[in-house]
Amino acid sequence: MKFIIKLFPEITIKSQSVRLRFIKILTGNIRNVLKHYDETLAVVRHWDNIEVRAKDENQRLAIRDALTRIPGIHHILEVEDVPFTDMHDIFEKALVQYRDQLEGKTFCVRVKRRGKHDFSSIDVERYVGGGLNQHIESARVKLTNPEVTVHLEVEDDRLLLIKGRYEGIGGFPIGTQEDVLSLISGGFDSGVSSYMLMRRGCRVHYCFFNLGGAAHEIGVRQVAHYLWNRFGSSHRVRFVAINFEPVVGEILEKIDDGQMGVILKRMMVRAASKVAERYGVQALVTGEALGQVSSQTLTNLRLIDNVSDTLILRPLISYDKEHIINLARQIGTEDFARTMPEYCGVISKSPTVKAVKSKIEAEEEKFDFSILDKVVEEANNVDIREIAQQTEQEVVEVETVNGFGPNDVILDIRSIDEQEDKPLKVEGIDVVSLPFYKLSTKFGDLDQSKTWLLWCERGVMSRLQALYLREQGFNNVKVYRP
């Protein structure tokens, strides 16, 4: 099988040296992602496209899907590469390839040509289009808005019969820009802002401020791992977890109620800046949007920025919530975010929307900054690839089974879309559907006399959720890995 990768248009308008660097990085990223599917595949870069050739036909759909999620790719063409002799030969090959698709349809032919030939692209379009129209009686030529567009590419003595076109996510290849550190909470905003910086070519590391115990961290790990696995797995990134409960306790005890929200955010920026400096990261990323909550007014954002020299990027600053939720839905983080608790918003009963610098600084003089230094020093830093393995160690008390007994029921915790695409059927046992994002509220409604075997395709989510349910006091859960 063969895929032709078309570059994001902004890459093609760069200077020659920059364009070549971007293409080289994108080629490496594609190799890093696809080697998990087929170690024998070849990735070859050219001036205006990248060619991917693989032998394992069983991995066709997986490879195609992975390519659509790699930043820097505008679209992917799945092609059949064949030699040709003349225009009539092109027509005959196109007829074999497209006859079934064109039955009863309107169509047009579009050709791109490179190399020296005694015909033009338009000549091929007319010849092939006329031939298809004559040989497929139910098909009809329509040059404007046809039902089917026959795409052909001619390069020297090779013909590319385009079997399908699939849109990529665009953007710049990860690694073409410098690293950033995303302050991730697991909600709608931080997930989308992290994705947007990945799409813009940054390697995104994650910094999580834990305000809600182990269950909160488990949920945020899921989001970070999902984002990395889906859009950024070409690179190694860090997941840094900071236990911020001591900081919150100090704020609640010593800081005036109205100033708590801004001061908490200032403490987070201070801590994240220390982490960024430690690892040589150039900027912080937040999901803040102007006016969305009290700490996100211009006055308060300016005061928050003042505590650090580190650049703070806010890609969602002008977005409204509906737009952000729609983006979360598109990238697949909506279900995570809907069940993620938001702790920052409840720290103050009457937060100020226009904090005064002198008052903020006066309140912060009451704060014991050794507490902040200590939590940063004790921050837990892991390679995000190890999250799955770390989860295995943490849930060692949760039994993993590959079979089942008479009192067992399999609980399919995949999202609804995944379940509809690939329904789970196991002979000899009941399978119940309950998406992972409903477990926290709906698992208690299930028959607790049964033993529930949590299942997901890769096993990461089922292990994380098993740990969460154990912490909630449910001991009748196991992880099912046949």
Curated annotation (Swiss-Prot):
It catalyses: [ThiI sulfur-carrier protein]-S-sulfanyl-L-cysteine + a uridine in tRNA + 2 reduced [2Fe-2S]-[ferredoxin] + ATP + H(+) = [ThiI sulfur-carrier protein]-L-cysteine + a 4-thiouridine in tRNA + 2 oxidized [2Fe-2S]-[ferredoxin] + AMP + diphosphate; [ThiS sulfur-carrier protein]-C-terminal Gly-Gly-AMP + S-sulfanyl-L-cysteinyl-[cysteine desulfurase] + AH2 = [ThiS sulfur-carrier protein]-C-terminal-Gly-aminoethanethioate + L-cysteinyl-[cysteine desulfurase] + A + AMP + 2 H(+). GO terms for cellular component: cytosol. Disulfide bonds join C344-C456. PROSITE patterns: RHODANESE_3, THUMP. One of its GO terms (molecular function) is CCA tRNA nucleotidyltransferase activity. Pathway: Cofactor biosynthesis; thiamine diphosphate biosynthesis. The keyword Cytoplasm applies. One of its GO terms (biological process) is thiazole biosynthetic process. It is found in: Cytoplasm. Its main location: cytoplasm. InterPro entries: Rhodanese-like_dom, Rhodanese-like_dom_sf, Rossmann-like_a/b/a_fold, ThiI_AANH, ThiI_fer, ThiI_N, THII_Thiazole_biosynth_dom, THUMP_dom. The keyword Glycosyltransferase does not apply. It comes from the Bacteria. It is an enzyme of class 2 (transferase). Its EC number is 2.8.1.4. Catalyzes the ATP-dependent transfer of a sulfur to tRNA to produce 4-thiouridine in position 8 of tRNAs, which functions as a near-UV photosensor. Also catalyzes the transfer of sulfur to the sulfur carrier protein ThiS, forming ThiS-thiocarboxylate. This is a step in the synthesis of thiazole, in the thiamine biosynthesis pathway. The sulfur is donated as persulfide by IscS. Belongs to the ThiI family. This is tRNA sulfurtransferase.
